[in-house]
Regions:
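Intrinsically disordered, low-complexity non-transmembrane regions of multi-pass membrane transporters
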Residues: 1-26, 137-139, 150-153, 178-193, ...
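Structural signature of multi-pass alpha-helical membrane transport proteins
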Residues: 2-68, 72-88, 194-264, 284-291
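C-terminal ends of transmembrane helices
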Residues: 53-64, 111-123, 141-146, 153, ...
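Transmembrane alpha-helix boundary signature
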Residues: 61-64, 82-95, 111-124, 291, ...
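Membrane-interface helix termini and inter-helical loops of multi-pass transporters
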Residues: 86-94, 175-191, 233-242, 266, ...
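Alpha-helical membrane segments and immediately flanking helix-loop junctions
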Residues: 117-160, 299-333
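Membrane-embedded alpha-helical segments of transport systems
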Residues: 136-140, 155-174, 285, 313-315, ...
């Protein structure tokens, strides 16, 4: 008798998740198509993110299961890899200098934003440093829980930074003429069914290998590497059908938007000023380093802006796809920052965070 209520509650929970997933997909598609119809730059990803984010803040039980998120990341990686060309690879000579400056910029952004949060919002040093660290959100969240930091406040600041960048960056770049507002023109050749199957199989295989090796963003980068090799060696010439590329962009936007579903409205409102202020500090510091790179290298302005933007790796690569921006350059820099943040943040917290015992000790 006791098994019946348990089975019913499980079925209800599963049904709620399915309905939440369907609602997320419908809202994301509607928002993306609306922004695309309005000819807004980065319309599919920005529209999906805004629509899902607003619904999540309104209390809708939105949900994106891991299998759908992984599928979206694989499709995005395949599309990014198909854009790789010899001309883009030739620009890699500038990477050591720009990646070195990115590491320094990350260090300055972390301490600059942390100082702002401590000075003007009275945050404790540990929470401020973790909230100010750009990228590697999963590692930051785990470390915050271990150190007894204010996890909800950190989540608000980190999420706001990603949301603002993803929504505003395409619009700013387009309005200033730095990046085109029109959707990117992809190769008109679509891979044959056999090529498409081989492309997807190779993408999943490499992604699984990277996942076993604990490589960050393994689904997206694995697919990107496989696609780059197959297209770069001319083994496959065609790419994904347009509708698949659209699904990838809408999916990424929906995934970002669902982050608000995990944040209470009261928590968001209580930390919105901290999020906006720390974001402004990070952008000012990033702009200084972007200016230095523009004066010392021949890298395009738009490429540097997106590569140095303190946003999520998957979101920034999706923007690179929609704004005609070098995916290799952006990917290399965001991956480098991910590694830098993951390696250095525990040491920074140990040296500069509040002195206390770990929660799990």
């Amino acid at each position: 008798m006791s098994l019946i209520p348990a089975s019913i509650s499980t079925a209800i929970a599963d049904r709620a998740k399915i309905l939440g997933t369907l609602e997320t997909l419908v809202l994301g598609a509607a928002g993306g198509l609306l922004f695309l119809w309005a000819n807004l730059p980065g319309g599919l990803i920005s529209g999906a993110m805004v629509a899902v984010g607003i619904a999540a803040l309104a209390g809708r039980p939105l949900h994106m299961p891991p299998i759908l998120t992984q599928t979206v990341l694989v499709l995005l990686g395949i599309t990014l890899g198909s854009l790789v060309s010899r001309q883009l690879i030739q620009h890699m000579s500038a990477y050591p200098l720009t990646i070195g400056l990115l590491a320094l910029a990350t260090f300055c952004m972390t301490f600059g934003s942390s100082f702002y949060l401590q000075r003007f919002h009275r945050w404790d040093p540990t929470s401020a440093l973790l909230a100010a660290s750009p990228g590697a959100l999963s590692q930051i969240t785990i470390l915050a829980a271990e150190k007894g930091a204010d996890v909800p406040a950190i989540a608000v600041v980190q999420t706001m930074r990603v949301i603002i960048l993803t929504a505003a960056l395409p619009l700013v770049l387009a309005l200033t003429g730095i990046a085109p507002s029109a959707p990117p023109v992809f190769a008109s050749v679509v891979a044959s069914p056999l090529e498409l199957a081989a492309l997807i199989a190779a993408a999943i295989a490499v992604a699984l290998l990277l996942r076993l090796a604990k490589f960050p963003a393994s689904w997206m980068f694995g697919a990107m590497i496989a696609s780059s090799v197959l297209h770069g060696t001319a083994l496959i010439e065609g790419g994904l059908p347009p509708w698949m590329r659209g699904v990838a962009l809408v999916g990424i936007g929906a995934v970002i938007g669902t982050r608000f579903a995990r944040i209470r409205k009261s928590t968001l409102l209580s930390h919105v000023n901290a999020g906006l202020g720390s974001f402004a500090v990070a952008i000012i510091i990033s702009a200084i380093f972007v200016a230095v790179i523009l004066l010392t290298t021949n890298v395009r302005f738009a490429d540097v802006v997106v590569a140095f933007a303190p946003g999520a790796m998957d979101a920034m690569l999706a923007l690179a796809l929609t704004l005609h921006i070098d995916p290799i350059f952006v990917g290399a820099h965001h991956l480098s920052r991910f590694v830098f943040v993951s390696i250095t943040t525990p040491g920074i917290i140990h040296l500069f965070g509040r002195p206390q015992e770990d929660v799990d000790d």
